[in-house]
């Protein structure tokens, strides 16, 4: 049962897990905040760009559509009924994840934290909370069918663990300047 919940939670969240990584790879371009300050600090910083947001969102949607193509054989192989993604749900998860990360950057700047500085709790769940809120607003029926209370609990427990493991791994490989 727990294996089924973990597989479903991970699969359902992949379109939200991947966009921020894709945004980093796309990097550069014009900052969303246009370089503007508010109360002596940047609104968001150079790390939040229009290009990264667009590429991250598109990557999440394309990933969801690719997952749809392999859902049936993956379900059979894993012995789990994995969900397929309606296009509005895919977009909401991907764009919601990007917006959650942008919102966290805003909060980090307001609290005096620099780009890349740790903000425990917020760093691990910002994108998940906004992605889930977005998908529940945009495609309520799909979200209720996929994100049962048990799956939501697994997502909220699993995500911080995945966040730490992937960030430490990226740091060890020299892909990140800090392990958080």
Swiss-Prot record:
EC number: 2.7.7.67
Name of the protein described by the UniProt record: CDP-archaeol synthase
Alphabetical UniProt keywords: Cell membrane, Lipid biosynthesis, Lipid metabolism, Magnesium, Membrane, Phospholipid biosynthesis, Phospholipid metabolism, Transferase, Transmembrane, Transmembrane helix
Cofactor(s) the protein needs: Mg(2+)
UniProt entry tagged with the keyword Transmembrane: yes
Pathways per UniProt: Membrane lipid metabolism; glycerophospholipid metabolism
Transmembrane segments: 5-25, 54-74, 78-98, 118-138, 142-162
Any matching Pfam family: CarS-like
Catalytic reactions on record: 2,3-bis-O-(geranylgeranyl)-sn-glycerol 1-phosphate + CTP + H(+) = CDP-2,3-bis-O-(geranylgeranyl)-sn-glycerol + diphosphate
Chief subcellular location: membrane
GO molecular function, a single term: CDP-2,3-bis-(O-geranylgeranyl)-sn-glycerol synthase activity
Domain of life: Archaea
Protein family: Belongs to the CDP-archaeol synthase family.
């Amino acid at each position: 049962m727990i294996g089924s919940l973990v597989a479903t939670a991970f699969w359902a969240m992949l379109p939200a897990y991947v966009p921020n990584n894709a945004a980093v790879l796309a990097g550069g371009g014009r900052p969303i905040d246009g370089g503007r300050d508010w109360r002596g600090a940047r609104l968001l910083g150079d790390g939040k760009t229009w290009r990264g947001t667009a590429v991250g969102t598109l990557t999440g949607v394309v990933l969801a559509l690719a997952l749809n193509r392999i859902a049936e054989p993956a379900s059979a192989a894993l012995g789990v009924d994995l969900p397929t993604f309606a296009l509005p749900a895919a977009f909401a998860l991907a764009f919601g994840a990007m917006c959650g990360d942008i919102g966290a950057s805003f909060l980090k700047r307001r609290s005096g934290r620099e780009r890349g500085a740790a903000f425990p709790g917020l760093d691990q769940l910002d994108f998940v909370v906004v992605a889930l809120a977005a998908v529940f607003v945009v495609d309520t029926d799909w979200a209720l069918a996929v994100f049962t209370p048990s799956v939501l609990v697994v997502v909220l427990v699993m995500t911080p663990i995945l966040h730490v493991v992937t960030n430490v791994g990226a740091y060890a490989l020299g892909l990140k300047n800090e392990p958080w």
